[in-house]
């Protein structure tokens, strides 16, 4: 509502699913910051997710639901900022959430367990989208959707106990 009243204000969407608000004065920008103060509080909470299967007809999994459950689990576990990287989640192979270029990425899938098909995501690691260092992540395996928040909490606790941030820890523990 606030932006609707500002002449020439625009919201621009980027390829990584983030949004930029442009054509604001300094005071207007400060007001937008105030209105959005309940946003991301850590690097992990700036994670990227496509719109997901709840809206996208191509999407196999609800990537937004996964992201929200992961953020809640990491907040509840009080994982410190820097212990987990920004993750990228795509609900299908189309890669709208750029899962291959994240340090940790997930792509919507299904996994059969005891003859029953369950919602799952394929895990990718070590992708990079930094210009000059671009690389596609390595596909590691498939994790049930319900297990991903706990996987990230365990990883975050492990990294936090090392006293390092995720980047330093990952470089010291490449496997």
Predicted regions and their residues:
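Long hydrophobic segments that form regular secondary structure
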Residues: 1-11, 151-154, 158-161, 165-175
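Residue-identity detector for threonine
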Residues: 25, 36, 46, 98-101, ...
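Small-residue-enriched alpha-helical segments and adjacent helix-cap loops
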Residues: 1-115
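Mobile "lid/hinge" segments at catalytic clefts and subdomain interfaces of large enzymes
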Residues: 105-164
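Noncatalytic linker/hinge segments flanking ATPase motor cores
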Residues: 28, 54-64, 126-135, 162-170
């Amino acid at each position: 509502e606030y932006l609707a009243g500002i002449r020439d204000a625009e919201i621009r969407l980027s390829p990584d699913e983030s949004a930029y608000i442009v054509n604001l004065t300094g005071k207007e920008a400060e007001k937008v910051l105030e209105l959005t103060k309940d946003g991301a509080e850590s690097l992990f909470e700036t994670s990227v997710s496509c719109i997901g299967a709840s809206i996208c007809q191509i999407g196999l999994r609800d990537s937004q639901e996964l992201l929200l459950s992961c953020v809640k689990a990491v907040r509840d576990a009080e994982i410190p900022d820097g212990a987990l990287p920004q993750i990228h989640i795509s609900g299908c192979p189309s890669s709208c959430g750029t899962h291959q270029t994240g340090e940790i990425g997930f792509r919507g899938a299904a996994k059969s367990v005891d003859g029953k098909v369950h919602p799952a995501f394929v895990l990718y690691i070590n992708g990079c989208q930094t210009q000059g260092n671009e690389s596609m992540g390595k596909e590691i395996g498939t994790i049930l959707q319900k297990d991903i928040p706990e996987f990230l909490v365990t990883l975050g606790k492990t990294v936090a106990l090392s006293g390092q941030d995720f980047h330093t820890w990952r470089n010291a523990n490449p496997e």
